[in-house]
A protein has these predicted regions:
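Post-DEXD/H (motif II) to motif III coupling segment of the RecA-like Helicase ATP-binding lobe
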Residues: 152-153, 158-223, 388
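Conserved interdomain hinge at the start of the Helicase C-terminal
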Residues: 237-276, 280-286
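Walker A/P-loop
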Residues: 49-73
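A short beta-strand element within the Helicase C-terminal
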Residues: 318, 325-340, 366-369
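Conserved pre-motif I regulatory segment
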Residues: 12-58
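Inter-Walker segment of RecA-like/P-loop motor cores
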Residues: 98-138
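Conserved helicase ATPase core of P-loop NTP-dependent helicases/translocases
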Residues: 91, 107-110, 115, 272-274, ...
Length: 414
């Protein structure tokens, strides 16, 4: 039906698992919840009444949704299944659980394509759950994970990405407590209402700008820089069909010149170059001599690149869509978007969100979007920005040459 589901029938009691957030396994206190994180946990729990226990918490990237999940686990005090977007996010959850709760390693297990262990707290991915056996029975063999333990809580990380097959199995889990975590409930397929109907109503939502004003997330400056097509590419664009028009504009080779200029400006910063098209990103990676991280990158290499970036040994990282979701890169302060998934508002928000963890000395994060002027690329860019402009963000619009000239004047006055 698509109506928010408020479960008042009560919940199945899962197997107990006392958890203390903020304490190490030897009882040392290390962390405490921020005021808004505590409020989010209490809004979900509702004092343990039937009005709590299922719903969605919406917080910006960098505001500590994982920590809110752990705070809810402490309140529920039962065995928990956590579903994430990919193996990197899965291992980040495990690392955070072991660092910020009193759970020991033997209590937190990974269930993925590489390792299939089940424990009192099990972290898995949507990908392994939706793996299909060709011609086999059952169709989704890993759905049995939902019944392997008497889970008292299921956490859906990045719940706006919930795949359709998981929608179906979630409909059979209404007797269990369910927590959805997300930075934006925008779905480009228009199925936001199904998230509410299956997980529960929105329990807590904090505006991005409010957290920025309270210094919980970094201030962000957003720029759209418009680049022209060459005369040859303009001719090719004019005769192309609609889908090819976008690709021609989005992969405009002239974006490389402005990209190099921005990188020179931010040579001392940690920079992400983010795009949609692999051939474009491969060319940029080769031109810059910077590593490319994409869907084909093995998990071990992926984690090594993330680690090098976090430690400052790697200043520039070229990334595909794999970096859109649930990737913890706290030191990234600049993102340069060279192409995106058409008019995806959710993707734009997630990409800006990679930068929002508070910076040393209160420095601003800077987000650049490189767009080909008077094309489908510019048209889709305006759609992509809608969610962030509704949150109070403003984009400064530049023609490429004007940006270079203004930047040169600024550098000369330093």
């Amino acid at each position: 039906m698509g109506y928010p589901c408020e479960d008042l029938a009560g919940y199945k009691a899962g197997d107990p698992l006392p958890i203390r957030f903020g304490y190490t396994s030897n009882g040392e206190r290390k962390y405490s919840l921020r005021p808004y994180q505590k409020a989010a946990c209490e809004a979900f729990w509702a004092g343990g009444s039937a009005r709590g226990g299922s719903g969605v918490i919406v917080l910006p990237c960098g505001a500590g949704k994982t920590i809110v999940g752990m705070g809810v686990m402490e309140k529920v005090g039962m065995q928990t299944l956590i579903l994430t977007t990919n193996v990197v996010a899965l291992r980040q959850w495990i690392s955070e659980l072991l660092d910020k709760t009193d759970l020991s390693p033997d209590m937190v297990k990974e269930y993925s394509g590489e390792c299939k262990e089940i424990g009192p707290v099990t972290v898995s991915t949507y990908q392994i759950l939706t793996y299909r056996k060709r011609g086999g029975k059952p169709e989704y063999p890993h759905f049995e994970l939902f019944d392997k333990r008497n889970w008292g809580l299921i956490i859906y990380d990045e719940v706006h990405l919930l795949p359709a097959p998981v929608f179906r199995i979630t409909a059979d889990l209404q007797a269990r407590r369910r927590l959805g975590l997300t930075a934006t409930l925008v779905r480009e397929d228009g199925r936001e209402d199904e998230v509410f109907s299956l997980i529960g109503p929105k329990k807590f939502d904090k505006p991005w700008k409010e957290l920025e004003e309270q210094n919980w997330i970094a201030q962000a400056l957003c720029h759209e820089i418009r680049v022209d097509l060459s005369s040859e590419d303009r001719l090719e664009y004019a005769v192309a069909d609609e889908r090819d028009k976008y690709r021609i504009a989005a992969t405009n080779p002239r974006k490389l010149e402005i990209l190099k200029h921005i990188l020179k400006r931010h040579q001392d910063d940690q920079v992400l170059v983010i795009g949609q098209y692999l051939d474009q990103l491969e060319g940029i990676s080769t031109e810059l001599g910077a590593p490319l991280l994409c869907g084909q990158t093995p998990n071990a290499e992926r984690e090594a690149l993330y680690q090098a970036f976090k430690e400052g040994r790697l200043k520039t990282l070229v990334v595909s869509k794999v970096a859109n979701f649930a990737v913890d890169l706290p030191d990234a302060s600049v993102a340069i978007q060279v192409s995106g998934t058409f008019g995806s508002r959710q993707e734009e928000a997630q990409r800006l969100g990679r930068l929002l963890r508070p910076k040393p000395q209160g420095d601003c994060a800077v987000f650049y979007s490189l767009v080909t002027r008077n094309t489908k690329d510019q048209e889709f860019s305006q759609k992509r920005q809608l969610f962030l402009t509704e949150q109070g963000y403003k984009y400064t619009i530049w023609e490429a040459q004007h940006f270079i000239e203004a930047d040169a004047r600024e550098m000369n006055t330093r």
